[in-house]
């Protein structure tokens, strides 16, 4: 298994990327072809579904970015970490925790998001 922190940072970079084509390429690097993200208001599976998640996030939270706010705790192919969705002015819009599964190739196989504060 590759370094879980680097993997998590790659998938956050993909979600933060404002350009849809670049975001799609980053998604393909960070997630397995059948990878999934399940969040209370939205979910997507496969590279197409994950690209749609990214599009929706950028539409609803223009100028915001995800920041990891904790270390990545990982073992046995699973991980978890805390995050914040930070607006252009530096204020935190939402906080949460992601848990998930890492594939053998080091990419993300699954992400499940829990929002903690909105």
Question: Locations of the language-model features?
Answer:
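Short acidic-aromatic low-complexity motifs
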Residues: 1-30
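Short aromatic/hydrophobic contact patches that present stacked aromatics
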Residues: 12, 36, 80-82
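A beta-strand edge to alpha-helix "cap/lid" segment located at domain peripheries
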Residues: 16, 57-118
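Alpha-helix boundary/capping and short turn/kink residues
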Residues: 17-21, 40, 90
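A solvent-exposed, acidic/Ser-Thr-rich amphipathic alpha-helical stretch
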Residues: 22-77
